[in-house]
Every structure is written in C-alpha cells, then in structure tokens.
C-alpha cells in the first residue's frame, strides 16, 4: 500500500471512531457532539494529503486486499477506487459536513437526543463516502441503500409531526422506485458479465444493451429527484435544517448524478441514453425553477433550487461532460449548504417563521447571515468570480457549442434565468425593506458555532471554484474559439433574470390582481403533480376497492349466496308443491259468484 491509499484509509477509520465509541461507555464521560465535529475536522485535514498526492501524480489507485465471498463464479472483494472523482469529492464532503456539524451544535442544542442525531449525520456521511469510493456494484449498493435509510431516519427526526413522517415515507418510497432500476442493472451485469467490478464491466461491455443503462438512469432519477420522481425533495424540508443542508449539498441528492458519472464509460457512445438524460434534465431544471418562483417558504425555495441544479447536472451528463457535472457537484455543495444554514439561522431567530412574506429588514438586524445569504444566492445564479460561476459558465458554454437537441438547450437557458429570479426574490423579501415580523425574543447571531460554520462556507462560496479549477486536471485547457455572444450567454441570461426579478417584485408592490392567474396556480401548486399523483390516483383506487369490497362482495356473498338464495329456493319449491296459487281476490269473486247464482236459483 502506498501513501495515498494509507492516508485515505486513515481518513475513513477516523470517521468510524465516534461510531465505535458510541457502542462503548466512553462517550458518557465526554461530550459526544464536539467529539464528532473534531473527528470530521481531523478527517478533512487528513483527506487533503491523498488528494494533493493524487493531484501531483494523477495516478489512480485501487485497494482490493480483502476478499469477501465467492458465490459460484462471482468473486466479491471489499475494494476502494481512489480516482479523480473520489479523491476530489472526499475533502469537499468532509469540509461541508464539518461546518454543518458545528452549525448543528447551535441549532439542535435543546434536542434531548442530540447525540443520536450526530451519530445519524455521521453515518449519513460515511455511507456516502462508501458509495463514492466503491470499486464494485455491490459495495456501491451498500452505500446507496445506506444514504437512503439514513435520509429516512433524519427527515423523520421529529417523529411527533405527521408531515415529517409523511415526508420520510415519501422519500423512501420514491427511492424504492429508483432502486428497482439499480437492482435491474446489477442483475444484468451479473448475468452477462459475471462480475460487479467496474474495470471488468467497462472492458467487457463497452457497448452494452439499453436495459442496464435505463436501469441506472431510473436509479439516478429516483435518488437525484429528476422529473417524475421529484416530489420527495421539497417534502424533505420537514426535517431539521442541518439535515436539509447535508442532504442537498454533498450526500444523497448528488448520489444519482455520481452514479451516472461513475458509469459514463458505458454511456459516452450511446446517443439514445444521452438524449434521454439531456431531455430529462432540461424538463427537471425548468419545471422545478417554475415551481420555485411562487413559493413562500424559504426552505422550499432553496430545495427547488437544488432540484433545478440537479437537472442542470443531468443536462451536463446528457451533453457528454461528466467531469463538468462533477465540478458543479463540488462547487454546488459549498453555497447550497450555506444557503440552508443561513435559512436555518433566520428561522431559528424568528421563532420558526419560514414565510418570506413575514420577514424583511433582516439586513440590519442580522448583517452576517444576510451577507452570507446574499453571497450564496449570487453564487447560485452564476455571478462572475464566485464559486458557481466557474462551473455554470462552462456548462452554458458547452451547451451552446454542442450539436444536440436545441429545444432542451433553450429550456436550460430559460431555467438558468429563472434561477436569478427566485434568488433575488429571497433577497428582496427576506433581507430588504421594512421588518414585517414581531419577535418575542431579541435576534442574536453572535454564537461562535453559528458564525464560524457559515464563515467557512462563505469563504468556500467565494474561493472554492477558483482553487478547484486551477488545481485539478485539466489545468491547461486548450484554447477555444467561439463568438463573443456565446461566451457572454451565461452572464446575459443571469442579468436578464435579475432585471425580470426586480420588475416582478416592484410590480407586486404596485398592482393587486383580483384572481391568481392559471400560471401562478400551476407554479404554486407544483404543477398539480402532488394532487394528481398523491390524491387523485389513490382516491380513485380507494373508491374502486371500496366499491369492489362493498358492492360486489355484498351482492354475491351477502345476497346471492345466502339469504336471497334461500328465499328464492323456498319460493320456487313452495310454488311447485302448493295447489293454491294465492289469488285471494279471484277466490272471493268465485265464492261471491257461486253465492249469487245459488240465490238466483232459489228465487
């Protein structure tokens, strides 16, 4: 084992120590939350060593020392793949999680089960790192299911709330649909390749069938909340804010895109699957951007922005740029985690108020949080020389210079301008103007746990893009020639979004619409998707099953088989046996006629 693999394993071992400590009685003598935070900070510093070694050497390493089991001809080993993607993602994930852990110590300080909460967050991070460093499908599946079950436990952390339980179930059920695709791909590779090791699969199946690729795309659609399987992502906001920050920045939601990046050697020559990814990503990024425009819950707006950015990453995969999609994952983690933490700070200080219409004037009362929120929002829009710019600008350039579906590319540009609209809307309503809230407690953002954690991510949102693009391969990009208007497209689209946002905000102050428009209803109701999928179809199924149970069962069993059948049998048998017909009127009439006839004869 070389230095790179040794330090990587040390990083993973440092992260597992708090879990082992929790099993023993040692943690009862020491505060557990600071210990977990310090462990992640140490793991981050340790992970920088193998990352810098990899950047300097550029040599991929595979650790495969532990044989696990042999099933007939399938040999399974615990193996770690230390390549470009895993080596660069580990420090980013650890840095972001370190800040989120420190923020959680402030945000969850009054929770009676805070130690368990920190253990869950740490296990969430470990399962994501297992997924990222896995060198075979089975190990990747363990990490994949691990982030799924940990998200279920963390989203439903406040289990006394019905909405939190429903959101947790929704997340796990939508991800089960995606897991069907993952298991389908695993079964196909086992049947046709007899291996789950990445290197062997890529050599044997350079041009595979569509079945495993469709399965992998379905898995990524479920985990990364693409259109069709997207409703769980905004619902996940029912969990605590640190969970939202970790879930949306560097763990679960990017796992689907990471899966496609890992399998890009099988997809790079398949135009059908690339077109599917491009169109799916374009629809997702536009639809979720439209939904974000009219939301009033600050966490829901940030959640829809995550879904929109995931759609943009899927578009990047669709134009065959996996390294660019990975760069956007790394850049996106910094400012998205910070946006959620700033939102959590505002919500905590305003006594759990999440409606941006009831905020305002926070720039004066919470200057540090407001400044950080503004930096994060501008980085999200792709403002030049902030972190988001370095990946988003390259994505828009690649989109403009690619020869693929023009409609999908146009939709992507429209969605990019909408990113600026909802980002400015948060700034306009929450930070500017006059206060529209009444607080029973004074607003305070002087806690060092809050300040230090947001400060680190604010620096990352400003500088991380520059450092990443200047230190990772390729460091020297070949000189490209393109017209000036294509180079400036990303900036022009963002400026257009800013102008539209200010115009809309000013218009809503001056005009009052009598009735909401259909477009507003579509956006505010999330495209009527939840009420169609979660209410209409289940209610129809319920009514149909109710009718089947009550009408059909009653008709056959309660009526036809027993009571009515017996009465019908008795009536038929009595009619056949009896001499009398039961015609009482006829009998009386015949008696009367005979009586009258007798009287006439006597007279």
From Swiss-Prot:
Core subunit of respiratory chain NADH dehydrogenase (Complex I) which is composed of 45 different subunits. It is an enzyme of class 7 (translocase). Core subunit of the mitochondrial membrane respiratory chain NADH dehydrogenase (Complex I) which catalyzes electron transfer from NADH through the respiratory chain, using ubiquinone as an electron acceptor. Essential for the catalytic activity and assembly of complex I. Belongs to the complex I subunit 5 family. The chain crosses the membrane at residues 3-23, 38-58, 87-107, 117-137, 140-160, 171-191, 211-233, 241-261, 273-293, 301-320, 325-347, 366-386, 413-433, 457-477, 482-502, 583-603. It is found in: Mitochondrion inner membrane. GO terms for cellular component: mitochondrial inner membrane. GO terms for molecular function: NADH dehydrogenase (ubiquinone) activity. It catalyses: a ubiquinone + NADH + 5 H(+)(in) = a ubiquinol + NAD(+) + 4 H(+)(out). The keyword Transmembrane helix applies. This is NADH-ubiquinone oxidoreductase chain 5.
